[in-house]
Amino acid sequence: MTSMIDIGTTGTARALTKTEKLMVRAMTTAWTAPMFAIVVDIDMTAAQTRRAEGVTLTDVILADCAAALAQHPAINAHYRDETVVQFAEVNIGLAVASDRGLTVPVIHGAQGLSLAGIAARRAEIVAKVRAGKIAIADVMGGTFTVSNLGMRGVRQFTAIINPPQAAILAVGSTEMRQVWNNGDPQWRPMCSFSLTCDHRATDGAQAARFLAALKARLETSTTPS
């Protein structure tokens, strides 16, 4: 239970919960890593057509991330004790905010799930977080994390890696922007994706290739996967 300490008219101090203490330790560890971030703008026209009942834009992003990560294991990796471990299994963590703080439940084996399967699993773990019923197994084993603040109206941001993971993807809001398409100015639903990486585990070229693969999938696929 969260405790409150009365400090008079200036306000109150709140002791950190166990979950918050763990997050503080993880974020402190993250700041010891040499991090870099790269950003790409993606046209979400095709991605928006893949939404359906029970399938959100976040689900589409998670599904295409899983496919791109399977092709680029240098991003689907951990760094620990001067060792880089690249994974064939794609276990995507999704940052979820609740009254209890920030939790990162994991969709295990995401590379083997359909879009509908990812949507169902995402809905399940988010509901468990919001209800305070998340289990230890639900937050263990992540190989990559996605943080989406687009629904909060945040255009672009840089996320901090979730150690020992090698990278984290920050997704901003999808908004209409004027872009040039084959020489013509057009209004398109654009979204900024920022990838933060641990330079000890990967490099800018590998990060750019992953984002290019993700961009290609989101911009060209118009059918559920």
Where are these regions (language model features)?
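C-terminal catalytic/motor cores of large multi-domain enzyme assemblies
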Residues: 1-225
